Amino acid sequence: MVVTIFAKIALMGQWVKYKAPFICRNTKKVSKSRWRWLSLRSNSKYMATVGFSERIYLQYLRTKFKTISKLAPATAGRMAFDLFCTPYPKYKKRKAPAIFHHAKKRTVVLSDQTKIHGFEWLPNKPNNETVLIAHGYASYAYKFEHYITPLLKMGYRVLAFDGPAHGQSEGKHIHVVVYQEAIQKIMEQAGPVHHFIGHSLGALTLSMIAENIGQAESRKFVLIAPATKTTTTFANFFKMMHLNEVTITAFLNDVSSKTHHKVEFFAADRALANYKGPLLWVHDEKDMVCPYEDIIDFKRNAPSNIKFLITNGLGHNKVYKTADVMDQIMAFLTPSK
């Protein structure tokens, strides 16, 4: 009986996972932009915008965790964390923007032999410094195409890699520790790196890098819409998945086991509390993925070396694509003469 139930759940999950994008193929908005596992990680306001296929899959997942938690709560917790760390399926090959055809392809290898693929651009008039771009969850390096040329014009060598389990890179899961190792390997194998730009999960990971990399006054960080408090992200995920307390406890234990830290450790405000180098923090007041409310206390008491650029109405994913925001980021990164 139990085996039959699990078999049906597994089959249903596979059907929805692979068929849902095609169910939605006649609805351009849904098939192109809304079929994203990111919706499973955000808050209830965002859920109001998701499509029919996502709601089917979400209900399947809720039923799955509820059933498994009754028999093996530790397993349910591990499976929930695995889901949290798994980007949505790569069912569509993306066309490379023109600027990427002029890049040199680079590959770095992680400790588990996972290959991380990226791109390198060299300026005509080098200033002998490098900028590394770290994209967010369920994103990829292509989305920062408009950053490349302005950085090259300022003389920077530019690196942009697809994170683990994203874009052209290998891997099945990503979380801060995995992403942090990837960035450290990029610095070792493709460095040196002098300045950093990161969005969302990439920005949170860069806050951890900033905490550990040293306090060089010449090194600049740009953090765009960082996941300020992982506890908020997890709480939204628990609520959305209808996880019970036993499963939540198992989930948090699995996080601690795999990362060697409690979830509270993974917070941009904690990591940057004593950081002394120049840093630009960009955030939108209407961000529904990484809430602006999470940064208010830190912003009020932040050290003077951290500058804030606060926008209104751009949300989480448009904030780094807007011309005015990009101009201010480039002004911040302009080399001193």
Region locations from a protein language model:
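An N-terminal hydrophobic leader/cap segment in hydrolases
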Residues: 35, 43-44, 51-108
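The serine-hydrolase catalytic nucleophile loop
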Residues: 137-148
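Conserved alpha/beta-hydrolase
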Residues: 148-170
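Alpha/beta-hydrolase active-site loop
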Residues: 173-194
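Hydrolase active-site cap/lid region
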Residues: 213-261
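Short beta-strand/loop motif that positions the catalytic acidic residue
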Residues: 275, 281-283, 287
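Conserved alpha/beta-hydrolase "acid-adjacent" motif
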Residues: 288-294
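Catalytic histidine-centered segment of alpha/beta-hydrolase-like enzymes
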Residues: 314-323
